[in-house]
Regions:
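C-terminal interaction surface of TIR/SEFIR-family domains
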Residues: 34, 94-166
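Short acidic, S/G/P-rich loop/turn micro-motifs used as interaction or catalytic elements
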Residues: 1-3, 60-63, 93-94
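Conserved N-terminal substructure of TIR/SEFIR domains
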Residues: 1-52, 144-166
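A short acidic (Asp/Glu
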Residues: 5-6, 65-69, 96-99
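Conserved TIR/SEFIR loop-to-helix hotspot centered on a Trp-containing motif
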Residues: 59-77
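A eukaryotic "domain-to-IDR transition" signal
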Residues: 72-105
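Structural alpha-beta junctions
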Residues: 13-18, 77-83, 112
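Conserved beta-strand segments of the P-loop GTPase G domain that flank and frequently precede/overlap
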Residues: 55-59, 88-89
Length: 166
């Protein structure tokens, strides 16, 4: 997914400030089983000054533990409001993706009464800007809908698309 993620950043970075967790080989690996420590590190290194988390969804994204960790940290209320949460399918998925469990727990098809929203790949910067603004507004208007009670994934899961563990 790295090529598509890089293209997304290149094409739309005028609309948002990219902070990417897990897309690059040189990203910090948070080697700990201490849930609190992992969430604090993600918050401090990647989310500290962000207000919206965009999950770019490839064919196997749903199986990756780092995605679960980033979503859990994003939804966590603490000294900051939780981040708004939105998902975007990457072009190679043909808009058919399996959502990460924690994302799906915060999403409803049709976007009625849910915290997270899921979108097909944007056709314009205006679309993306509108979606980001909606996700930011959700921090104040829909935070009561957040479902973030499940524990963090300890391991990568088996991909529902290809059957491999990533």
């Amino acid at each position: 997914d790295r090529v598509e993620v890089d293209a997304f950043i290149r094409n739309f970075s005028s609309v948002f400030i990219p902070k990417v967790l897990g897309a690059n080989n040189n990203d910090d690996f948070i080697d700990s089983t201490n849930t609190e420590y992992v969430m604090q590190r993600i918050r401090r290194l990647y989310l500290q000054d962000s207000t919206v988390t965009i999950v770019l969804l490839g064919n196997c994204t749903h199986a990756r533990r780092y995605i679960d960790w980033e979503i859990k940290s994003s939804l966590r209320a603490g000294s900051n409001l939780p981040n708004g949460l939105m998902g975007i399918s990457l072009p190679s998925t043909n808009n058919k993706v399996n959502l990460p469990e924690r994302f799906e727990s915060n999403w409803v098809q049709g976007h009625a009464h849910c915290y997270a929203k899921f979108w097909n790949y944007p056709t314009s910067t205006r679309d993306l800007q509108d979606w980001i603004e909606d996700a930011q507004e959700s921090r104040l208007t829909r935070a009561y809908l957040i479902n973030n009670s499940d524990g963090m994934k300890r391991y990568n899961g088996k991909c529902k698309k290809c059957g491999e563990t990533h």
